[in-house]
């Protein structure tokens, strides 16, 4: 069709019992948009939820040892949660990918451990960190239908032959990788979907930032993909303030800034953004 649709789902941020309303919203969104891929952009797991109390880690660098029994229990709880919010995708045969936010790790599991668990579920296309420099994500058949990373059709049926493939670009950081989207003839990349692990917390306070390795990976991507990319990450960029306009606190649609910007209220700057944008 020449079209490729991405559905982004952010901040599910639930414990082991995912809200029925959340699952219903995911189902309705999938049916309304019929995406080719879904990207979960962080904070899928509310690591601070009481269910994870025995393995809770407030900051990644906390040195207190967590008993293996608690971690093992948490792994099962995480599997239970993931199974609930990815079930609508599995039943519809929609592939998906995830990156991480500032609360996922607080359950006590590292992003690498979470990545391993996510890959157990049907439809997940997260690559092993620093995997093969070139890895198949989609195989384009003569009829144009895609074959997913694990060799199954999008509907979960058996493997079939393919006529070409697109490369996946993994990195050393779990949750950071690139998915090139090819044209209908599978001859060239026309778009890159880039997931970035944007960090969680900084030692000096406040939120963290992407690692130097992640930034180096991103810097090399334009030449490797050869097409413009869309980037998906959890943490908003400070540069977002460059497309906002300060207004009075009682102005229509005004939103309060954060931390050093907390004394100012903003709306989208119409001269720097496209029509139809939303700040909220």
Question: Language-model segments: which ranges?
Answer:
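Active-site environment of divalent metal-dependent phosphoester hydrolases
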Residues: 15-16, 46-49, 98-110, 201-204, ...
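Beta-propeller domains
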Residues: 229, 233-244, 258-280
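Active-site neighborhood of phospho(di)ester-bond hydrolases with catalytic His/Asp-centered motifs
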Residues: 7-10, 38-43, 96-102, 231-233, ...
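Active-site-proximal beta-strand elements of phosphoester/diester hydrolases
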Residues: 3-13, 190-200, 232
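Short, glycine/charged-enriched secondary-structure capping and boundary segments
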Residues: 22-23, 53-56, 111-115, 245-247
């Amino acid at each position: 069709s020449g079209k490729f649709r991405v559905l982004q789902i952010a901040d599910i941020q639930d414990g082991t019992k995912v809200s029925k309303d959340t699952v219903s919203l995911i189902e309705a969104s999938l049916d309304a948009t019929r995406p080719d891929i879904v990207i979960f952009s962080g904070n899928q797991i509310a690591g601070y939820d009481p269910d994870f109390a025995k393995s809770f880690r407030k900051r990644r660098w906390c040195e207190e040892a967590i008993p293996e029994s608690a971690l093992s229990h948490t792994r099962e709880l995480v599997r239970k949660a993931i199974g609930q919010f990815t079930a609508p995708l599995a039943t519809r045969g929609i592939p998906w990918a995830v990156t991480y936010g500032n609360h996922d790790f607080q359950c006590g599991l590292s992003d690498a451990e979470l990545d391993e668990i996510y890959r157990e579920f049907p439809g997940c296309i997260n690559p092993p960190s620093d995997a093969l420099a070139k890895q198949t994500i989609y195989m384009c058949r003569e009829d144009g239908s895609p074959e997913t990373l694990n060799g199954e059709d999008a509907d979960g049926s058996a493997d079939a032959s393919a006529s070409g493939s697109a490369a996946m670009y993994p990195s050393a950081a779990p949750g950071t990788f690139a998915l090139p989207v090819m044209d209908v003839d599978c001859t060239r990349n026309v778009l890159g979907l880039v997931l970035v692990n944007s960090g969680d917390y900084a030692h000096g306070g406040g939120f963290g930032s992407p690692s130097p390795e992640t930034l180096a990976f991103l810097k090399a991507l334009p030449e490797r993909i050869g097409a413009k990319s869309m980037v998906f990450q959890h943490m908003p960029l400070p540069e977002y303030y460059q497309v906002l306009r300060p207004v009075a606190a009682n102005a229509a649609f005004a939103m309060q800034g954060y931390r050093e910007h907390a004394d100012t209220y903003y709306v989208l700057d119409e001269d720097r953004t496209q029509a139809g944008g939303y700040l909220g």
